[in-house]
């Protein structure tokens, strides 16, 4: 029995699902599976932009099997997929079924996604997988059910082969976040192109081009969906790559160079950070003079006591990277595989033969001497891309998160080694953290990224902050029209990531546009921005007040001013300002209580 879609003339319906004859329950499962796969496909349309949020897609279908509306999360901080879908469906949402690739990510008191489904009159919700983060898992499902909405989760409420395949598609589109929830390293993909005889270059080192133009376009798409691209020093020396996504808009990944000796050329395409940043990771103490040269070009250098793929990936895990694309040579690839940090392999095999006993292969020595030791890929896929064959598969399976929901009767054991009078520390950084919403760059769907906006203002005292949107609604006294243009682009950016990219690029390309007194006023500006944010969202204020007696630390390993640093050496000004704001709110509460009691 098959399910197909055809265009429907009944506006505003988009398409109609047509079922062939067969068992009703099987048809039911097939319909659910098809719409869940569609939701998963939708969620991937903004891959790379939604981080640190998951990829969300939503399809609204009527009882007759028609798609009434659909939507996907464009980027972190934009309108939820569920809200977009019910807006598109309009009156057809009432009594309909909503298909979600993942449980709604409503968190930190923001119930936009769930509220949209409830208010639209959705009767049933089918969820591909529960939210992978422990502190969010099951919350939205419980809330939906509390409103009388039927909620089914694939693999829990019913099972079948077709539903299992649909569930797998949901796991695939959010594999990076799922891996983060279960491990301490980002989801890593090893990508390479090789000839039919297994060579990634000729004996001379020449490698342009092994694969076809179509395959290289797919590589750009892979980069655009990754947080970072990593190469070794040899790749920089021989190929001088740019490692850009080359799509002209949206997400551009960070470039990472991993080199033990720091034996790198003084001039390289990767040292141009006007559009995208570059991070060089190396052994501690390596070529200090060259480190200074890189720093003068705007390249960040991070030193390690023991430079190896595992340590490097754990570091970038702390920095909040979800997905890494490895485009390195065979030596580094072998080291990464041996360190168990590679989860997936994507290989483009070209119908060419180059030969050569010294021609490099995609993976160096792994210490294996028998074929029985070979690593077998799982969930292997084959796809023809132009003249090339794309082979992909997993070295490590995607963790299958069980719906571990704490019992209402569960008790918490007290650790006798912990001093109850010693103030505890609350770390926050990314949105997946329990208190991650405190980061100033994390916003809800109506706000804008204010850090860069205010940094580029020449007249902060004349800047007005709108309390509902946390945006500057009036800009006065700009001395340079280019600064005004930049601010307008930031103000109208669709997401905080896009706004931050505009700001970073402007600071690199036109540093003269930054207000001269920024270093003197940035703490004051940040405090006002925090007050505006917490005044706009009362639930954030309530969460802040619930942390009385704790020390708040932004766990940024690389920002030594706003964050706590890699080893606690940072100044943690963001955490300090939050604690100052908490004290201010507590003072206001005390004054209010005194007035009430005196009355």
UniProtKB/Swiss-Prot annotation:
Residues 1-17 form a transit peptide. Pathway: Cofactor biosynthesis; riboflavin biosynthesis; 5-amino-6-(D-ribitylamino)uracil from GTP: step 3/4. Residues 30-152 form the CMP/dCMP-type deaminase domain. CDD domains: NADAR, Riboflavin_deaminase-reductase. GO terms for cellular component: chloroplast. The keyword Hydrolase applies. GO terms for biological process: carbohydrate derivative metabolic process; chloroplast organization; FAD metabolic process; response to high light intensity; riboflavin biosynthetic process. Its EC number is 1.1.1.193, 3.2.2.-. Its main location: plastid. Keywords: Chloroplast, Glycosidase, Hydrolase, Multifunctional enzyme, NADP, Oxidoreductase, Plastid, Transit peptide. It catalyses: 5-amino-6-(5-phospho-D-ribitylamino)uracil + NADP(+) = 5-amino-6-(5-phospho-D-ribosylamino)uracil + NADPH + H(+); 2,5-diamino-6-hydroxy-4-(5-phosphoribosylamino)-pyrimidine + H2O = 2,5,6-triamino-4-hydroxypyrimidine + D-ribose 5-phosphate; 5-amino-6-(5-phospho-D-ribosylamino)uracil + H2O = 5,6-diaminouracil + D-ribose 5-phosphate. One of its GO terms (molecular function) is NADP binding. InterPro entries: CMP_dCMP_dom (IPR002125), Cytidine_deaminase-like (IPR016193), DHFR-like_dom_sf (IPR024072), Eubact_RibD (IPR004794), NADAR (IPR012816), RibD_C (IPR011549), RibDG_C (IPR002734), Riboflavin_Biosynth_HTPR (IPR050765). Unlike bacteria that have a bifunctional, two-domain RibD enzyme, plants have a monofunctional reductase and a monofunctional deaminase, each having an enzymatically inactive domain. The C-terminal domain (416-599) is not required for the reductase activity while the non-functional deaminase domain (21-150) is necessary. In the C-terminal section; belongs to the YbiA family. Pyrimidine reductase involved in the riboflavin biosynthesis pathway. Also has a non-functional N-terminal deaminase domain that lacks the catalytically essential zinc-binding residues. This is Riboflavin biosynthesis protein PYRR, chloroplastic. It comes from Arabidopsis thaliana (Mouse-ear cress). The gene is PYRR.
């Amino acid at each position: 029995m098959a399910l197909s879609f055809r265009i429907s003339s009944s506006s505003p319906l988009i398409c109609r699902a047509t079922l062939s004859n067969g068992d009703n329950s099987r048809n039911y499962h097939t319909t659910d599976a098809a719409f869940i796969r569609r939701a998963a496909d939708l969620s991937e349309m903004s891959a790379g932009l939604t981080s640190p949020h998951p990829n969300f897609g939503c399809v609204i279908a009527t009882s007759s099997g028609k798609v009434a509306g659909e939507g996907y999360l464009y980027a972190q901080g934009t309108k939820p997929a569920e809200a977009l879908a019910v807006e598109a469906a309009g009156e057809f949402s009432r009594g309909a079924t909503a298909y979600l690739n993942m449980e709604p990510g409503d968190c930190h008191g923001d119930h936009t996604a769930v509220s949209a489904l409830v208010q639209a009159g959705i009767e049933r919700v089918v969820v591909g997988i529960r939210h992978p983060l422990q502190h969010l898992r099951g919350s939205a499902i419980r809330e939906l059910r509390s409103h009388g909405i039927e909620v089914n989760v694939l693999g829990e409420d019913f099972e079948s082969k077709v539903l299992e395949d649909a569930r797998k598609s949901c796991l695939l589109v959010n594999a990076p976040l799922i891996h983060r929830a279960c491990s301490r390293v980002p989801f890593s993909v090893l990508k390479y192109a090789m000839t039919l005889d297994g060579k990634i270059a000729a004996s001379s080192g020449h490698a342009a081009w092994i694969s076809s133009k179509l395959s290289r376009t797919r590589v750009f798409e892979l980069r655009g969906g990754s947080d970072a691209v990593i190469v070794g020093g040899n790749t920089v020396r021989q190929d001088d790559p740019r490692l850009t996504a080359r799509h002209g808009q949206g997400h551009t990944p960070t470039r990472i160079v991993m080199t033990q000796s720091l034996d790198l050329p003084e001039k390289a395409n990767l040292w141009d950070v006007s559009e995208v940043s570059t991070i060089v990771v190396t052994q501690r103490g390596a070529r200090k003079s060259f480190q200074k040269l890189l720093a003068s070009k705007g390249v960040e250098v991070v030193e390690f006591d023991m430079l190896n793929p595992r340590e490097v990936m754990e570091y970038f895990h702390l920095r909040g990277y979800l997905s890494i694309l490895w485009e390195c040579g065979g030596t580094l690839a072998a080291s990464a595989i041996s360190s168990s940090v590679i989860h997936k392999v994507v290989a483009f095999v070209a119908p060419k033969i180059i030969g050569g006993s010294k021609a490099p292969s995609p993976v160096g020595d792994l210490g294996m001497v028998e074929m029985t030791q070979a690593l077998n890929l799982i969930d292997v896929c084959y796809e023809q891309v132009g003249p090339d064959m794309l082979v992909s598969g997993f070295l490590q399976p995607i963790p299958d998160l069980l719906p571990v929901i704490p019992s209402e009767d569960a008790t918490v054991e007290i650790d006798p080694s912990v001093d109850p009078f010693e103030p505890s520390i609350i770390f926050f950084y990314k949105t997946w953290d329990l208190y991650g919403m405190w980061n100033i760059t994390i916003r809800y769907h109506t706000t804008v990224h204010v850090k860069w906006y205010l940094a580029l203002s020449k007249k902060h005292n004349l800047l007005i902050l709108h309390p509902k949107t946390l945006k500057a609604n009036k800009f006065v006294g700009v001395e340079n029209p280019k600064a005004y243009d930049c601010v307008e682009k930031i103000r109208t950016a669709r997401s905080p990531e896009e706004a931050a990219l505009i700001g970073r690029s402007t600071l690199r390309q036109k540093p003269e546009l930054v207000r001269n007194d920024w270093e003197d006023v940035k703490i004051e500006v940040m405090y006002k921005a925090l007050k505006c944010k917490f005044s706009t969202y009362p639930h954030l204020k309530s969460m802040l007040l619930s942390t009385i007696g704790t020390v708040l630390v932004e766990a940024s390993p690389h920002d030594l001013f706003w964050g706590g640093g890699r080893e606690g050496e940072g100044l943690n000004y963001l955490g300090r300002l939050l604690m100052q704001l908490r004290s201010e709110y507590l003072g206001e509460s005390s004054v209010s209580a005194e007035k009430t009691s005196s009355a």
